[in-house]
C-alpha cells in the first residue's frame, strides 16, 4: 500500500538517505536538481507522490527540456530516476515508474567541452575551489553553470540586479537591445531557483571580488571584470582552465609537465 507523501517530504527523505553515503557537494547537486522537480510539482498541482505516473514524469521532462543543455537535462533526469527508485522502495510511488524515465541520448560533440564532465570530477573542482579559489570569479562561474545548467551566454547576460538573494533566484532575461540576447529569445526567459550554498557563494563573490564596473549600456553585470561585462571567449577560457585536471588535481592525466 502506498503511503501519502508530498513531493517535498519525499525529497527530504531521499536526501536524508544519501547524505551519509555521498560527498556533500554531490548531495547538494541532488538537492538542487530535485528542487526543480518540487517547483514543477507545485505548478502542476501535484501534492501527493502517489499520483506520479510515467506520463507525469514525461511532462516534467518536457517542462525542463529547452531551458538547459542536453547534458544538463540528462544529469537532472538521472538524479530524478534515482529519487523515484528510492520512492518505489519506500512505498511512495507505484512500482516500476522509475523505469519509465527516458534519458536523452548524447551524441559525440554535443557537450560544450567536447568531453563529458562527470559528477565526481565536478565535485573535485568544487572542493578545490572551496579550498584555494573561494568566491573568485572562476569559482562563481563554474558553480552557477554546474548547478543551474544554464548556457554560458545566459550567465554572461545576468546583472547584479538579477540576483535575488532573499528568495534564492537568478532571473534570466532576453535583452538584445543591450547586447545580451538569449539563444531562444523570450521563450527561455525564466527565474532559476538556486540552493542556499550557491546564494552564499554569490553574496561572498559580490562582497569580496566583484569590481562593480558598468558595461557600455549602464548595466552592472553579475559576472563582471574591470572592463565591464565579460566577453564570451573570456568566460569560456575561465571554464576551460578550471576544468583541466592538471589545474584542480595538480596532476596531468597525460604525464606531461603541468607547467606546459
Positions of predicted regions on the chain:
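Basic, Lys/Arg- and aromatic-enriched nucleic-acid-binding interface segment
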Residues: 119-152, 217
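Hydrophobic (often cysteine-bearing) scaffold residues that line and stabilize catalytic clefts
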Residues: 30, 76, 137-138, 231, ...
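Conserved tyrosine-mediated DNA breakage-rejoining catalytic core shared by Y-recombinases
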Residues: 157-201
Amino acid at each position: 500500500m502506498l503511503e501519502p507523501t508530498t513531493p517535498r517530504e519525499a525529497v527530504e527523505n531521499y536526501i536524508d538517505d544519501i547524505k551519509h553515503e555521498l560527498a556533500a557537494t554531490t548531495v547538494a547537486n541532488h538537492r538542487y536538481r530535485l528542487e526543480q522537480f518540487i517547483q514543477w510539482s507545485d505548478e502542476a498541482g501535484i501534492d501527493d507522490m502517489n499520483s506520479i505516473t510515467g506520463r507525469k514524469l514525461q511532462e516534467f521532462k518536457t517542462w525542463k527540456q529547452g531551458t538547459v543543455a542536453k547534458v544538463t537535462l540528462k544529469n537532472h533526469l538521472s538524479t530524478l530516476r534515482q529519487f523515484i527508485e528510492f520512492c518505489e522502495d519506500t512505498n511512495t510511488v507505484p512500482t516500476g515508474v522509475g523505469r519509465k524515465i527516458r534519458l536523452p541520448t548524447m551524441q559525440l560533440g554535443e557537450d560544450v567541452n567536447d568531453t563529458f564532465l562527470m559528477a565526481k570530477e565536478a565535485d573535485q573542482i568544487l572542493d578545490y575551489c572551496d579550498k584555494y579559489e573561494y568566491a573568485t570569479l572562476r569559482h562563481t562561474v563554474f558553480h552557477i553553470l554546474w548547478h543551474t545548467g544554464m548556457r554560458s551566454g545566459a550567465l554572461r547576460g545576468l546583472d547584479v540586479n538579477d540576483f535575488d538573494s532573499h528568495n534564492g533566484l537568478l532571473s534570466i532575461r532576453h535583452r538584445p537591445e543591450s547586447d545580451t540576447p538569449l539563444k531562444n529569445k523570450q521563450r527561455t526567459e525564466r527565474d532559476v531557483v538556486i540552493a542556499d550554498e550557491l546564494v552564499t557563494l554569490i553574496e561572498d563573490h559580490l562582497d569580496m571580488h566583484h569590481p562593480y564596473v558598468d558595461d557600455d549600456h549602464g548595466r552592472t553585470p553579475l559576472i563582471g571584470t574591470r572592463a565591464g561585462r565579460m566577453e564570451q571567449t573570456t568566460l569560456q577560457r575561465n571554464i576551460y582552465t578550471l576544468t583541466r585536471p592538471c589545474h584542480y588535481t595538480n596532476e596531468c592525466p597525460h604525464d606531461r609537465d603541468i607547467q606546459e
